[in-house]
């Protein structure tokens, strides 16, 4: 079998035209490789059995499994299967960094802060030590409890940094109206200006002041909530909207698993109505959910049927993550939500019914540990090796001759569906939002910048390699300006986080390359790569409304779930780290940087590969083929 090497990816990389022979290794069912630490030959690895919040004593892990119990890893050294040590003792290079990010402590045991912290939204499941610390943070909870969040609900529009000038002008008008009303109150010898609300000469001015004052009070209240988290200083809780306000809102959104828009949008305003302890409890449930998914090997989350269910009455994901626009109707033979009921069952067995109960449990289990609980059975079609396939619907496609001057909001967004053969029935397991290509900047050979259409290839492909902790080898066509970030102190820095590996990598946490199969005259096959793949993404909001450079982006936490599911339910071989020598000098504003990457990631080869079919979608533009002309680069 021949395989055309991938260099980079849908970030504009050109695939290698050469092919190399695939390594011939014997494949083994992934179930044999999964958690080797749970059992040890000739010994009893004990786990704690818990039922309805009560400790039932210790039991050998093998006995617990034989009794139909599920073993949950609640240690702070847990990682998804993708990043865990293999049965042969191989450790993915990203393993240690994953644990550092999950525990929010770096290699020197210093706190990870700023933009490097709060990576749950980008695919890193927080350690239970983080949950324990947040629930026990009494000063923070007391600060929030002293604030009545109700005034925030008076906002009837979304505010952002773009609203800075409007907010400032509105506040000036508020002060002017308040001064005028106060003077009239004094002139009439009123105790308060309320009677002016019904005075024909003053009611309009009073109504305008009242609305502006409600907006000001709402902003001040929201900023006080953010101050409790340490993200705003006292002087920034003045009702203005600055870049510091936007940054603080983004941190709040990242901490509470909301889309990181930096906007005071409806979801964020609603979350601010929720107590800090309740928000921390929801974090605990999200952490537990990923441990349950890992332990049971399930992936079915209801997105292919009637949608995800609440866990203990709580929806754990924002609505935008539950379905692509235009893809909410149940699919034929769509699998029901198993993830939420399984998580709720685990929470009930552990006694995690509220913030105080979780806090007490974690206080009694400071080291975490592995526990055995009784959970509902997994579907009968689950097996160590399953017949799986995937389909990507490109949704509504517009082949515009030139980049449109606005962001097009299509009715039918792209989606990815994973199927399983359920004893002859093609069962849709999940249906997740994704992206397709569009217009993007590209550097030409002469150094000039243009925009070029980045097409998402249509037709049958396969996923052969699952690459955990992938790096992005930025091709020469990627402009230098896209590889640097402004430090806002007169200097720039290389975007090492975008090169990876890590949650902010251009490929996210997992990459599944799309390979095209060609038959050879000798009966063999050649696998060609065109630089397109399915992968995680730190560009969370682009999955809701944006486009890519041709690849199919997934929310990082879902990409990790998909990669884990493939390893649990598909024969594979461990290829290990993929060495590479990537070097590039990046120059911007008289500063130079050297990019250095020595691995493409830790690879697992699926045997056989999983079939993927990319549908043409609904081409709604007059033009029916991708545009070939270039367009001026974005300013």
Can you name each region flagged by the protein language model?
Residues 10-635:
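N-terminal pre-domains immediately preceding structured catalytic cores
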Residues 1-9:
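Bacterial N-terminal signal peptides
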């Amino acid at each position: 079998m021949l395989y055309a090497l991938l260099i980079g990816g849908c970030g504009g990389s050109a695939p290698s035209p050469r092919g190399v022979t695939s390594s011939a290794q014997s494949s083994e069912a992934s179930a044999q490789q999964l958690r080797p630490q749970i059992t040890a030959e000739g010994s009893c690895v004990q786990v704690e059995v818990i039922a309805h919040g009560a400790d039932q004593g210790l039991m050998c892990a093998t006995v617990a499994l034989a009794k139909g119990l599920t073993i949950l890893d609640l240690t702070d050294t847990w990682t998804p299967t993708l990043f865990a040590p293999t049965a042969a003792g191989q450790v993915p290079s990203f393993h240690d960094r994953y644990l550092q990010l999950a525990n929010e402590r770096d290699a020197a045991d210093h706190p990870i802060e700023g933009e490097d912290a709060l990576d749950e939204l980008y695919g890193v499941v927080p350690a239970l030590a983080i949950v324990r610390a947040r629930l026990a943070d009494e000063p923070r909870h007391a600060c929030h409890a002293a604030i009545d969040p109700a005034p925030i609900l008076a906002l009837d529009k979304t505010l952002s940094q773009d609203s800075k000038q409007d907010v400032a002008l509105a506040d000036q008008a508020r002060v002017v109206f308040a001064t005028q009303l106060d003077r009239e109150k004094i002139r009439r010898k009123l105790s308060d200006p309320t009677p002016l609300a019904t005075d024909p000469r003053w009611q309009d001015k009073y109504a305008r002041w009242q609305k502006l004052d409600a907006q000001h009070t709402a902003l001040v209240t929201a900023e006080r909530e953010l101050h409790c988290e340490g993200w705003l200083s006292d002087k920034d809780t003045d009702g203005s909207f600055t870049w510091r306000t936007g940054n603080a809102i983004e941190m709040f959104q990242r901490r509470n698993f909301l889309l990181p828009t930096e906007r005071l949008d409806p979801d964020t305003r609603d979350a601010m109505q929720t107590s800090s302890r309740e928000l921390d409890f929801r974090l605990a449930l999200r952490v537990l959910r990923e441990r349950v998914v890992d332990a049971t090997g399930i992936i079915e989350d209801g997105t292919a049927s009637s949608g995800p269910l609440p866990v203990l009455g709580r929806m754990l994901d924002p609505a935008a993550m539950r379905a692509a626009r235009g893809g909410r109707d149940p699919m034929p033979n769509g699998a029901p939500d198993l993830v939420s009921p399984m998580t709720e069952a685990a929470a009930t067995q552990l006694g995690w019914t509220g913030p105080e109960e979780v806090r007490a449990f974690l206080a009694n289990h400071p080291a975490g540990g592995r526990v055995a609980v009784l959970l509902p059975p997994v579907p009968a079609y689950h097996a160590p090796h399953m017949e799986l396939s995937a389909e990507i619907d490109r949704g509504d496609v517009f082949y515009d001759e030139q980049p449109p001057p606005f962001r097009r909001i299509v009715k039918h967004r792209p989606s990815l569906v994973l199927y399983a053969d359920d004893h002859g029935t093609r069962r849709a397991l999940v249906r997740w939002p994704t992206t397709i290509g569009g217009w993007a900047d590209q550097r030409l050979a002469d150094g000039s910048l243009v925009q070029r259409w980045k097409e998402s290839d249509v037709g049958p492909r396969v996923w052969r390699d699952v690459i955990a902790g992938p790096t992005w080898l930025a091709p020469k066509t990627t402009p230098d300006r896209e590889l640097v970030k402004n430090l806002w102190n007169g200097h720039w820095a290389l975007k090492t986080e975008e090169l990876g590996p890590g949650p902010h990598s251009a490929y996210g946490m997992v990459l599944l390359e799309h390979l095209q199969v060609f038959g050879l005259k000798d009966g063999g096959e050649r696998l060609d790569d065109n630089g397109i793949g399915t992968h995680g993404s730190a560009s969370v909001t682009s999955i809701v409304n944006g486009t890519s450079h041709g690849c199919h982006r997934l929310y990082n936490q879902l990409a990790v779930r998909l990669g884990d599911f493939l390893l649990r339910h598909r024969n594979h071989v461990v290829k290990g780290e993929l060495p590479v020598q990537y070097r590039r000098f990046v120059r911007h504003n008289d500063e130079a940087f050297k990019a250095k990457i020595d691995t493409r990631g830790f690879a697992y080869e699926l045997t056989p590969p999983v079939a993927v079919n990319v549908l043409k979608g609904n081409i709604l533009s007059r033009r029916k083929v991708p545009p070939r002309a270039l367009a001026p680069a974005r300013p």
